[in-house]
């Protein structure tokens, strides 16, 4: 071997000795650069609210008429933000709408209860008898007898009497709702709950029991209609339950236990995106349910206006009556969306009555399923919102016909409380979608894109490092 070849071999050995350290440094440098760029984008997204990307908040991807309704998305968002949501937020804090009577413990009529959740947030703080309004304790107006199922082993939570005041609630009598499984006729096992002290939020209620509730609702009582379905009646129940489900998920994600050890609560945007925002049909169904319930409230205007919301606190009761009238007679509502949903188009034709009975039975089963929820606070809000939805169905589809045996609307106090609180829950969910969805969707889609790009990015880094060898 000549001297030139020997020198070239020695030079090549020296280059190999520093290629690997240099390649390692390149890998580290590029990985840090990629990580820093990713993290800086996430931080920038949250810190700079005035960036040009925020202009997307004003557009939104939900436009045009809401399916099967009489209003468009932009009108609903503006009306909800400017008028309805502020009114409802004030209304549900008044003494009349703050207290809800509920049977918290009842045997599940379908299967043994085996799904208690693990967090203290599952439990409900009941009202002592001296807290809820005195008029609520007065004798109720006699009404129709009830043959509903009674709990055989449910523990009495408050032993509070049924309370509809003959003077305070003109026309509010004990009456059956053909759409719901009424279990509030046994006063001995009823409790009054302050809804403001028991907010709808994450409770840790998960697992087979929670899944079984929704599986039973969707598979047995509320199957999704086929893509070619033209019968509107068959769509209504599914869309209502889907919209309610989406709203419940929205509230859970918005008030989530992020760190149990530190009792840190906040918004779980990943859950919000995964459960609701990345599914446009769920968002649309939420808007549909909101307008459906809003239509029920406006249709009951004459009844709700004449009722007295007596709690014994004169100033607060006057405020409640004023807020109710502002809600019912809002000029913006009457101008922009006077008929949110047209119920007259349903139940037409020869099969209409039979179809209505079928859907009533399905919704009654859904109502009864709330007794199978293995979490006290989840059961509270499930019962309240399902009763509110059942009240909306009663107002829209059971007035002036044989379903209730009378030509005039009659509501229980608890039905009105549930109806207004449900409307507020849906209003909050719609507002959160409008306010948050552009930012949340953009952030989550960016993160998904970056996670998907990681394998290719690492491969490029490795190829670059190997090229030095």
Curated annotation (Swiss-Prot):
Modifications after synthesis and translation: N-glycosylated.
Required cofactor(s): FAD
Glycosylation-annotated residues: 365
Chief subcellular location: endoplasmic reticulum
GO BP term, example: protein folding in endoplasmic reticulum
Enzyme class (EC, first level): oxidoreductase
Membrane topology, record value: Peripheral membrane protein
Binding residues annotated for FAD, in chain numbering: 201, 203, 214, 242, 245, 275, 282
A single Gene Ontology CC term: endoplasmic reticulum
Disulfide bonds: 52-71, 54-69, 108-372, 117-122, 222-231, 375-378
Subcellular location: Endoplasmic reticulum membrane
MF term (GO), any: protein-disulfide reductase activity
InterPro entries found in the cross-reference section: Ero1, ERO1-like_sf
Signal peptide annotation: 1-36
Keywords (A to Z) from UniProt: Disulfide bond, Electron transport, Endoplasmic reticulum, FAD, Flavoprotein, Glycoprotein, Membrane, Oxidoreductase, Redox-active center, Signal, Transport
SUBUNIT field: May function both as a monomer and a homodimer.
Family to which this protein belongs: Belongs to the EROs family.
Function: Essential oxidoreductase that oxidizes proteins in the endoplasmic reticulum to produce disulfide bonds. Acts by oxidizing directly PDI isomerase through a direct disulfide exchange. Does not act as a direct oxidant of folding substrate, but relies on PDI to transfer oxidizing equivalent. Does not oxidize all PDI related proteins, suggesting that it can discriminate between PDI and related proteins. Its reoxidation probably involves electron transfer to molecular oxygen via FAD. Acts independently of glutathione.
Protein name as catalogued: Endoplasmic reticulum oxidoreductin-1
């Amino acid at each position: 071997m000549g001297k030139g070849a020997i020198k070239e071999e020695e030079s090549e050995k020296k280059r190999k000795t520093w290629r690997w350290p240099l390649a390692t440094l390149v890998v580290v440098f590029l990985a840090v650069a990629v990580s820093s760029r990713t993290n800086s984008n996430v931080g920038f997204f949250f810190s700079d609210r005035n960036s040009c990307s925020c202009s997307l908040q004003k557009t939104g991807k939900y436009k045009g008429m809401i399916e099967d309704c009489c209003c468009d998305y932009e009108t609903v968002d503006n009306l909800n933000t400017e008028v309805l949501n502020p009114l409802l937020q004030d209304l549900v804090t008044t003494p009349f709408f703050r207290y809800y009577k509920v049977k918290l413990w009842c045997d599940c009529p379908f299967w043994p209860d085996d799904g208690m959740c693990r967090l203290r947030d599952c439990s409900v703080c009941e009202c002592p008898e001296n807290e809820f309004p005195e008029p609520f304790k007065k004798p109720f107006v006699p009404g129709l007898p009830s043959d509903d199922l009674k709990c055989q082993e449910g523990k009495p939570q408050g032993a509070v009497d049924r309370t509809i005041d003959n003077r305070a609630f003109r026309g509010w009598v004990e009456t059956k709702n053909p759409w719901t499984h009424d279990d509030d006729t046994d006063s001995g096992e009823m409790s009054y709950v302050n809804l403001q002290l028991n907010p709808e939020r994450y409770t840790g209620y998960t697992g087979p029991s929670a899944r079984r509730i929704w599986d039973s609702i969707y598979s047995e009582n509320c199957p999704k209609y086929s893509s070619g379905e033209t019968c509107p009646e068959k769509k209504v129940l599914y869309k209502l339950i889907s919209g309610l489900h989406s709203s419940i998920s929205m509230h859970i994600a918005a008030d989530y236990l992020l760190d149990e050890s530190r009792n840190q609560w906040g918004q779980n945007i990943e859950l919000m995106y995964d459960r609701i925002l990345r599914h446009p049909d769920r968002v649309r169904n939420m808007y549909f349910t909101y307008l459906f319930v809003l239509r029920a409230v406006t249709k009951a205007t004459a009844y709700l206006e004449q009722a007295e919301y007596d709690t014994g606190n004169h100033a607060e009761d006057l405020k409640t009556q004023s807020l109710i009238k502002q809600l019912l007679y809002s000029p913006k509502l009457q101008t922009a969306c006077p008929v949110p949903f047209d119920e007259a188009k349903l139940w037409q034709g020869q099969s209409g009555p039979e179809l209505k009975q079928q859907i009533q039975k399905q919704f009654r089963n859904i109502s009864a399923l709330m007794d199978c929820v293995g979490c006290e606070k989840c059961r509270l809000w499930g019962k309240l919102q399902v009763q509110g939805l059942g009240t909306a169905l009663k107002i829209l589809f059971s007035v002036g016909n044989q379903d209730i045996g009378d030509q005039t609307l009659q509501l229980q106090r608890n039905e009105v409380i549930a109806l207004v609180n449900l409307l507020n829950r849906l209003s909050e969910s719609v507002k959160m979608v409008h306010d948050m969805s552009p930012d949340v969707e953009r952030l989550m889609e960016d993160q998904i894109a970056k996670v998907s790009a990681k394998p290719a990015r690492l491969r490029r880094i490795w190829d670059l490092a190997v090229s030095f060898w």
